[in-house]
Amino acid sequence: MNAPLIWAGLPVFFGVVLWLIKKYPRIQLLVGIGLYALFALLAIFLPIENPLGTQQAGFIIDSSLNILGRQFVLTFAEQPVLMLLFGFSAFWMLGLFSQSHAIRLIPYGLVILGLLTASLMVQPFLYAALIIEAAVLISVPLLADPASRSSRGLVRFIIFLSLAVPFTLLAGWAANLAEANPANGMFQIRAAILLALGFSFMLGVFPLFTWMPMLSEETHPYVSGFLLNLLSVVILFLGVRFLNTYGWLRTMAGVPNALQIAGGFMVLSAGLWAGFDRKLIRLPAYLNVLQNGLALVALSLRGDSPLVLFSALLIPRLVMTAYLCLALSVLAHRPVLEKGAFAAYPFAAVMVLVSIFSMAGFPLLAGFPSMLLLLERLGQQAPATLALVALGLIALIGAGIRHMISMVSPPADLEMQGLAVEPASGLLLNVYFTAGILVCLIIGLFPSRIMPAAEEIVRAFQNWR
């Protein structure tokens, strides 16, 4: 037995098995959540390259697997990343108890997560782009909605992610040439440019993020939210792995500034778009772009702990996005998404606002401690980027205030006729949203509980200095 087979091969296998029993959705849901949780627990307690059991009946889990001449490697130091991915997925799947329309996410999510995990393990790095492309293509049936009249967002999703593949492949090739010819700086410049182009398409660097809000509008918010966040987090970790492996690229003149400029404009543009766009259903896409920009800005900082700040931003992002997308799924039952939402679904409406303000770094909420630390570092190292980030966050807070005013305003008479098409959210959802608000406050009030976990997540990237 080896680690890549456990955390990459088995999820794909079980995802296919669960897809075959789609006629039994309740069994599919329970078994699927159990599998997500099991893989997360194995990432915590199952040691790699350490003997298990007695000397007579023990065994060792190997860290590598060779397939077609390519090596998949997973070390003990990388297990916290797997815990984050599988734990986040298990937490997300809990919301499917109230979202039967999105239950197909269980089998597809396992297959996609297995492939994305494999992309983090494969060596050489350049083959990760091909595995991500396979995950993107497998997600097409998940995102395709037969009831939707438009599929422009899905088409752009495929096009933009596919365009990233050749640039990423060429970036890996150029980086290997640069290592073999360190005296030739042209190879280093080519590798940096190609890598920037590839990740710009994948992360939605301004202005290449137009497909994200379109995809969020066309598909179920709980499905698109999961896929966008999972893809973004894995791609960010791939970028960190690339910079950790090729240290000369991380310290190359102009790379930190490029990360700051790209990240700053992502935060600013996403905040402004969220502020002016009146369609609440598109909000998770803008928040995804904004959080990706904050991650790039964190990676550009100098000092001993940019990676810790990077991972500290991820934890509240994943938690609050899950609650936000679930709340939007509840509000989507109404003929009019926003107006009168407080009267019809008060817990879901409050959860939407708490999520928005948390990701904007509002005091006492989950996103505040890491956001405060990021703004403090930017004030010391990059005041111009600080201005871009601050303007984007202010615009996002303005969007939250505008949505709040719309939610408390009574709907028009014609809208009231369809207000009771769906019953009010049940007790389980109300408890779930209440727990989410409490979790948000606990993370904001006691950030010291999060920092050790953030340090563990990035312990695999030891070359980062």
Ranges and model annotations:
Residues 1-8, 13-97, 106-107, 455-460:
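Transmembrane helix-loop-helix hairpins at membrane boundaries of multipass inner-membrane proteins
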Residues 62-80, 188-192, 379-385, 465:
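Short aromatic-rich membrane-water interface segments that cap or initiate transmembrane helices
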Residues 63, 195-262, 285:
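Short helix-boundary/re-entrant hairpin motifs in multi-pass inner-membrane proteins
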Residues 345-347, 401-465:
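Cytoplasmic/organellar membrane-interface segments at the starts of transmembrane helices
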Residues 21-27, 106-193, 201-205, 274-337:
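Alpha-helical multi-pass transmembrane bundles of energy-transducing inner-membrane proteins
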Residues 1-10, 73-85, 124-135, 187-201, ...:
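Structural signature of hydrophobic alpha-helical transmembrane segments
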Residues 67-127, 144-148, 152, 232-235, ...:
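Helix-loop-helix module between adjacent transmembrane segments
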Residues 213, 312-336, 349, 384-424:
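Predominantly late transmembrane helices and immediately cytosolic-facing juxtamembrane segments
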